[in-house]
Every structure is written in C-alpha cells, then in structure tokens.
Amino acid sequence: GVSTILGAKKVYLLAWGENKAAMIKECVEGPISDTIPASYLQTHNNAHVALDLSAAMNLTRIQRPWLVTSCEWNDKLIRSAIVWLCQLTGKPILKLTNKDYNENGLSELLALYGSAYNVNIKIFNDLQHTITGWPGGKPNADDTYRPERAKPYPKRVIIFSPHPDDDVISMGGTLRRLVEQKHEVHVAYETSGNIAVGDEEVVRFMHFINGFNQLFNNSEDQVINEKYAEIRNFLKEKKDGDMDSRDILTIKGLIRRGEARTACTYNNIPLERCHFLDLPFYETGKIQKNPISEADVEIVRNLLREVKPHQIFVAGDLADPHGTHRVCTDAVFAAVDLEKEEGAKWLKDCRIWMYRGAWAEWEIENIEMAV
C-alpha cells in the first residue's frame, strides 16, 4: 500500500502524455488526498517525478511560470499571461489596468512595455489577427496581418482525417469554406474506422444487399447468398469480446466509407478527391493497434507526392482516447520529413495546420487561425 511505498529510500513517479497532465498537477500541486494516492509522495523527502513535457503541461512552472520565477518573455508567453489574467480578473483585454498586472505577478510586462495600455493593445491585435473568413487566404488582398497567405490561389489542400468523420466533426466549417472559395480540396481518411461500427449496422446492410439480389437478380448471385448466410450465422454465434472476422471488418469499413462519401458530396467535394488510405497499423480488429510502420508512412507519402499540397491540415487533438489521432499525425509528419530530406520542391510552398475538435479545443493563446 501507500505506507510501504513511503517507506522506500527513494521513489520515482513516471508519467508521459497529455492524458496524464491533469492528474500530475493534482499529485504534485494539489492537496494530499486519499482519492489520489500519489499525492502522498509530497510528504516523502526523496521523491522524484519524471515527466515529458506533455504530462507536465499543467504544472504552474510550465503553464504559468511568471508566478514562480522571472521569465524570458516572448510573444507566445505574453499572450498566455494576458489570457490567464483576463480569466482571473473577469475583464476583457482592453480593460486590464496597471493594478491588475502588479497584483498578479506580471509587473515585468509593465517594465517591458511601459504600461498596461501598450501590452493590452499588442495582445488584442495579435488575437484579432487570428480571426479570418478565408482559411485558404484571401486572393488579391493584403495578407500582412492574415493567418494564411493570399498566393497561390487557388490552393491544393489535403485534410487528413484519422477516422472517417474527424474532418467534418473537427473542421467541417473550414472545409466548407475552402470548397466555397474554389480551392482544390482533398480529404484523406487515414484509417477505416471499422471497429466503431455496430453489428446491427452490418445486419442492416446485409439485409439490403440480399434484398437487392432478390429483387434485381432473382437471388442468383451466389457470392451474396453465401456471404449473407455466413455473416448472419457468425453474428448469431458471436459472444461479447469475440473479434470480428476479416469479412465483417471489411463490411464495417465499407459502411464508414459510405458515410464519408456522403459528407464529401454534401460539401461539394468530388469523390475522386476522397482518398481512403486504410493505414495498416489500424487493422488489428481490436482497440489496441500496431505501432506505426514504414508501410503506413509510405502510403501517406505517395498521396503527398501525388497532390503536392499548398496546405495540409492534420489532427491536433492528440489526447483522443484510442491514440489513433497521434499515430496518424505522426505518420504525416514522418512522410513530410522524408520528402524534406529528398528536397521536394512542393514543400517550399506548403503550410501545415493542426486542427482540434472532438477531444480537445485549442486554448485561446495557442490559436493561430480561427475561422
């Protein structure tokens, strides 16, 4: 138990990843509590906490360093401090005063900029310039203070969607704007998403295709007849925890493809610009996936070579519960790195944007483009 651990001469607590950040903050900085046994390590005189930056991101010294030490101020840190001060005081940026800065550990900014007014104006303008109605850049307009450049126009765009719904869930409005503003938009669905489909959906679609075979082909298609019987029997005998057969996983993947095509059609994206990559790491039939491999990276790389995009959108909500978003984004970055090593010319005119949606939102201070 806890008392045995506390009796050790030295204790190490290890953690990594964004999903541990909130708990680490409670363990290290929160009150000692029975509900968080690791918080008792605060009483140990030789306890060490080893973290990566993602797990440490909520600690005061990382998130709000101005409260514990002098800072080397840069634009990002100043923006973080002002957003925090607004939330703390309940005031909008332009109403912050010298007193607010002095009473909350931000007097260094007054010394740096001369007054609260000067800091307020700077950060207000910085945040205002992230807001745009032109995610692909506004053609024939001054782009000095816009988040995306005006040229080239139109742009070739790839939106990488880890599952066949993340594109519309997380950046559906942005996707629609890009299409409406005449950019060449491609959507790359990185995984099949098959394990998210329920067995009842498979039964429904099998009833449909069997009925189609009966009505239009007098039930003469033996492949459909055999698969219909085989899959119905399999699902009838299937127990909780049993893995799906490869055929059922394929059908579930087809169902997700149909949903994705419908979404693209609704947003006026030609079906030839819908790319189903079916990255191999995902195809285990289980929640636990395989590690990313060279085969995964090569599939992504081939698409990049084909399209030569000016904009790439990848999932930035890396704390999704299954870890698929992080692996998919890593595959894109690995492919880009390989292209960079080979001196790919298209990369010189390409920008990568990370979107968030279903599992996490960007903090105000970290937003670079809000559409």
What are these regions (language model features)?
Residues G1, T89-I158, R177-E180, E190, ...:
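Metal-dependent de-N-acetylase/amidase catalytic core
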Residues G1-I82:
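Conserved phosphate- and dinucleotide-binding cores of soluble alpha/beta proteins
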Residues V11, A47, V185, L271-E272, ...:
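Hydrophobic anchor at the start of a short beta-strand
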Residues L13, V49, I159, V187-Y189, ...:
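Structural beta-sheet core signal
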Residues W16, D52-S54, P162, E190-S192, ...:
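Cofactor-binding loop segments of dinucleotide-utilizing enzymes, especially the Rossmann-like FAD-
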Residues K25, V168-G172, H322-T329:
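Conserved strand-to-helix beginnings and helix N-cap segments that scaffold or border functional pockets
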Residues I36-P37, N225-D247:
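Charged, composition-biased interaction segments
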Residues P162-E180:
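Di-metal (Zn2+ and/or Mg2+/Mn2+) metal-binding site signature of metallo-dependent hydrolases
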